[in-house]
């Protein structure tokens, strides 16, 4: 499992997240709520649902800060990376 930590970098679209370094992120608004595109330290990009208590998959509480976000609970990609997003930093467990 990847144990890297990194600072986050805000991007202006989801393509920039794919091309950016680990920690790159972009927040978009959908009809269902906000979604964060996030590049994990394992190098993979994932969509993180920022809707609390959703019934159609995992979701995270978000502090609303679009520059240095904090998410709860931890983010876990099985077998690859597990950590916390706190104050604009991805911290490996």
Protein language model regions, located:
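Aspartyl protease active-site motif detector
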Residues: 40-42
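A short Gly-Trp-Pro
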Residues: 1-37, 46-93
